[in-house]
Amino acid sequence: MSISITLHRSGTSRTQQVDTTTTGLDLFGSDRAVVAMRVDGNLVDLQRELHDGAEVEPVEATSEDGLNIIRHSATHVMAQAVQQLYPEVNLGIGPFITDGFYYDFGNIEPVTPEVLSELEKRMKRIVKENQRFVRRVTTEESAREELADQPYKLELIGTKGKGAEGASVEVGGGELTIYDNVRRNGEVAWKDLCRGPHVPSTKYLANTFALTKFSAAYWKGDQANDQLQRIYGTAWASREGLAAYQQRIKEAERRDHRKLGAELDLFSFPEEIGPGLVVFHPKGAMLRHLIEEHVIARHMEAGFNFVHTPEITKGGLFHTSGHLPYYADTMFPPMLVDEERDEEGNVTRAGQEYYLKAMNCPMHNLIFRSRGRSYRELPLRFFEMGHDYRYEKSGVVHGLTRMRGFAQDDSHTYCTREQAPGEIKKQIEFFLSILADFGLNDFYLELSTRESDSAKKEKFIGSDEDWQVATDTLDQVCRSTGLQLVPDPGGAAFYGPKVSVQVRDAIGRTWQMSTIQYDFNQPERFDLEYAAADGTHQRPIMLHSAKLGSVERFIGVLTEHYAGAFPVWLSPVQVRLVPVAEAFNDYVTGFAEVLGSRGIRVETDLSSDRFGKKIRNASKDKVPFILIAGGEDAEAGAVSFRLRDGSQVNGVVLDEAVRIIAAWDSRHRNDDPTAETLRGVVDD
């Protein structure tokens, strides 16, 4: 007796007859590159028996689904190893995440690097046992009995995917299932509440995983719940995939902006000031100034009106905008101002609550509303380097990329509904051109919309009709750009959908940069209007946008993108003059004055260090032009260029040297000068 299935693979389809007991392992078992399968579009284990008429497609280990399955299987192996080492541990959840996985544990002693090493050894032994992952459907009653000593699992049973972030890997789906890890002799080595799917056996994980770090966590992500310990790992489709990832991590560590910020004397985060707040040193402040100066100039060229607003405001403004109460958790607590009391302490004059500014849009609305507006003024674009403050939990602040105090290149455009599509497209093109100015050219778009679940719509304001119009407008504009568009359901701001530009840096990591949001709510809340051509008063549409995201975050990303070796036009110090000996100090000092008078950022190293050390120091500081002067140079009125790649161009007369450096600065090139390209830029 047989059944008919259709196998889809590598772009081809083939219908074939197979036995009624045929599983995915029978079809793909000899191919270790296949870790699971899709049956009628659903991800399932290879051990699953097929049904008549099934549409079957293999899941390759290197695919996104395949890697997620490998990583989730690795979490089970890790949790088994943890439970071997700590039998009384309470198991939390263990989902896959980008590039890896984690598992949360309660009732466990503090994890250390030595513990991670021991756990990896145990995981390798488990993998060597070639334990099978066996799916078992159970009832809620049976599951509670089996997992009676696991309080977090008991809490998850019956939730069917609701509750903790990542819990869907435990109990999502239509059935309650447990996965057993079964040894060759049939003995169950370990089990976990899980919906799967998993790789067929632990041998599929051989030489593909590593444990990476540990941290504190809270059950269900809520600080009111138990504190747990989270262990992270990574897993890949092959030994080579793991090695490549580990190399990327090493490169990312080398480029870490926090490390480079200290080494290059750009910025610091003094404990005396507090987490999430940065101090820019002279070189870092110059880098910041250069970025802001360029962005401001580009906005002026594009028809934006420069404005400025204060950094504190009465709380009522944020109630009008709707940020209170929707945004309250991410704002600093209010300050009570102007309260007066008599000698007995009785309040004689009520104070008012003031807030640090968390966003600029409410104040820009007040500028729009300050006088009557005509349709002839639209689109009206306001732009500000606004300084904002948001209360990020101390555990999530991260260098310059997640801060409590930051500056936004923030703009708000007021336009008619008819103008909105064209204005959005124009601004997206503007975003991309600014990012390209800084050497960021690899990007895609992400469209963030509100939750479709009616129960979760409460955190969003506005009518369904307005949301649909706004979302459709952004979607259509994004598609017209020809760029890749990735959906982000639930990621919208409370007042409207958002498009963000996701940028890939020099080592392939993705960063959110520019954003534009369609807002139909704030014009209503602030009673904004303009006089239309027919004499009626109409509500404008409001477009929020930021090109860099935040200046600080952009500096962090740019520092890592260039590994601290900024292009000539952005380098805080463009030239360092190094005399071969003390006898040439006056010569290089005089030339430094010439360069400085041309606006070139120059330093001289007149220290008592030996010449070789001076060169090493300049290279370590990533100065793009090291100019060396010795006897022959001084006699010829010249200098020698030493460049970042180690190449050298000797005997460049001073006038030509000035022209070369000035040209590299003014042309805003983002590549490094080489011996071959050094002079060519003058003739571009």
Curated annotation (Swiss-Prot):
It holds the Pfam family HGTP_anticodon. CDD domains: TGS_ThrRS (cd01667), ThrRS_anticodon (cd00860), ThrRS_core (cd00771). Keywords: Aminoacyl-tRNA synthetase, ATP-binding, Cytoplasm, Ligase, Metal-binding, Nucleotide-binding, Protein biosynthesis, RNA-binding, tRNA-binding, Zinc. Homodimer. It is found in: Cytoplasm. HAMAP family: Thr_tRNA_synth (MF_00184). Residues 1-60 form the TGS domain. Its cofactor is Zn(2+). It catalyses: tRNA(Thr) + L-threonine + ATP = L-threonyl-tRNA(Thr) + AMP + diphosphate + H(+). It is an enzyme of class 6 (ligase). The keyword Zinc applies. One of its GO terms (molecular function) is threonine-tRNA ligase activity. Residues 256-567 are annotated as: Catalytic. One of its GO terms (biological process) is threonyl-tRNA aminoacylation. The gene is thrS. Binds 1 zinc ion per subunit. This is Threonine--tRNA ligase. It comes from Cutibacterium acnes (strain DSM 16379 / KPA171202) (Propionibacterium acnes). Catalyzes the attachment of threonine to tRNA(Thr) in a two-step reaction: L-threonine is first activated by ATP to form Thr-AMP and then transferred to the acceptor end of tRNA(Thr). Also edits incorrectly charged L-seryl-tRNA(Thr). Belongs to the class-II aminoacyl-tRNA synthetase family. One of its GO terms (cellular component) is cytoplasm. The keyword Zinc-finger does not apply. Its EC number is 6.1.1.3. InterPro entries: aa-tRNA-synt_IIb, aa-tRNA-synth_II, aa-tRNA-synth_II/BPL/LPL, Anticodon-bd, Anticodon-bd_dom_sf, TGS, Thr-tRNA-ligase_IIa, Thr/Ala-tRNA-synth_IIc_edit.
